[in-house]
């Protein structure tokens, strides 16, 4: 099993640096060079290590073309994960939808809703909910979705069951920070407490959770087993600086 990052970079030093870092970590990628600057994000951490983001606009990843190399990844994908942020521009949004249209019928399609600043609309969210079979969302995003779609009064579990049924999802993953996490599936509810750890920062914690959960499901683990491992890996990432620390072998066997 291997993963591939799909994006775009600019003809600039930042793009070169991004590829060098990915190469050093032996990560696979398909990132066409386009006539826009490589994307940047300014991250500020509060005293609890929780990040806020200033995400620059009009950058390379807003303009990802659907190339033959990207099509090749789509038609062979066992899983794909995308968010709402990458859909803020029409170009990349169309590429994402075209990618999804080329995936196999049994592909795990994970919509990590990833609400950032004001870079989302009800229409974009609805379209992705229709196209995914797994939703990953956090408790703050769930509140926002409840307000957007007219069910703010429901408690978190009932909101999750409602979304799961309305969009015919296979699974819904809800993370609630220090208050634990849930996985909902038809007839199944899994809850895991969040381990108490010394937090360096939480950048990358959500993505490591999603990636671990996805890989575990693809390997045939049960929802409960995948959930347990995802919680452990996410907690470990919180103890490290940066979004992509080396994961201990005990979690990758």
Where are these regions (language model features)?
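Acidic, amphipathic alpha-helical patches
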Residues: 69-70, 125, 160, 199
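Conserved beta-alpha-beta core of the PfkB/ribokinase-like small-molecule kinase fold
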Residues: 79, 83-158, 180
